[in-house]
Amino acid sequence: MLLRFTKMHGLGNDFMVLDLVSQHAHILPKHAKQWGDRHTGIGFDQLLIVEAPNNPDVDFRYRIFNADGSEVEQCGNGARCFARFVLDKRLTAKRQIRVETKSGIIELDVRSDGQIGVNMGAPRLVPADIPFQAPAQALSYQVDVDGATVELAAVSMGNPHAVLRVADINSAPVHELGPKIEHHPRFPARVNVGFLQVIDRHRAQLRVWERGAGETQACGTGACAAAVAAISQGWMDSPLLIDLPGGRLSIEWAGPGQPVMMTGPAVRVYEGQVRL
């Protein structure tokens, strides 16, 4: 059978989006891995699946597969593309959309200027909730990587993140440390790794090594986690502008127990069909 799909991106973080509300198919990890290959498939960072909800209090269910076939809990840039997609495809007329994810409910707001705001919910900082192995919660942790000590913050935005502060974003060891921290035994579910350079109290630059995808052009949940770490440690103040290789995100966070608000664009690239 042929399935219709849409290729989209949020700041260069690119997605294949499938509507399984009006189409019906059973998507497996092997399909995500096959389609995600940039040489022999369609090529993407993540596959986003739009489904009818299980919960009557939400509008849609949102599933996410990495290009390596692993299903993950959350994707912030994908959430913005999800909102743009369901409106463009007339699956809803709402501009405030509630979506069920593997890690909970998020709220999407499609604004008149085309930007999309996402209420990502409150960050989780208790180590067991991330998950991260540590005896107690702290603002930062020291982790042994190949005999060297790396200081990092650990945050869950529905998916796990490690945040490292660096002096120079251009020389940050993203490809050296990223995969080692991603697979570090203290992160039993693996982890996304952000490298953050603080510019001033409200501006920063960020590169992210994504779990199951490698370095991407942008990572929405990574920007949220970096903002939480920077505000918690007193490096920065809300609101924040975070520049990633693919563009800029606006992040607001009022402090512990409060939701993180992310705002940025979502772009449709092309439509296609793929054989299942």
UniProtKB/Swiss-Prot annotation:
A GO cellular component entry from the record: cytosol
Active site per the UniProt annotation: 75 (proton donor), 219 (proton acceptor)
Pfam families on file: DAP_epimerase
Site-annotated residues for Important for dimerization: 270
InterPro entries: DAP_epimerase_AS, DAP_epimerase_DapF
Binding site for substrate: 13, 46, 66, 76-77, 159, 192, 210-211, 220-221
Primary location group: cytoplasm
Keyword Cytoplasm part of the UniProt annotation: yes
Xref: Gene3D superfamilies: Diaminopimelate Epimerase, Chain A, domain 1
Catalytic activity from the UniProt record: (2S,6S)-2,6-diaminopimelate = meso-2,6-diaminopimelate
One of the protein's GO biological processes: lysine biosynthetic process via diaminopimelate
Known pathway: Amino-acid biosynthesis; L-lysine biosynthesis via DAP pathway; DL-2,6-diaminopimelate from LL-2,6-diaminopimelate: step 1/1
EC number: 5.1.1.7
Top enzyme class: isomerase
Job of this protein: Catalyzes the stereoinversion of LL-2,6-diaminopimelate (L,L-DAP) to meso-diaminopimelate (meso-DAP), a precursor of L-lysine and an essential component of the bacterial peptidoglycan.
Protein name according to UniProt: Diaminopimelate epimerase
Organism: Pseudomonas fluorescens
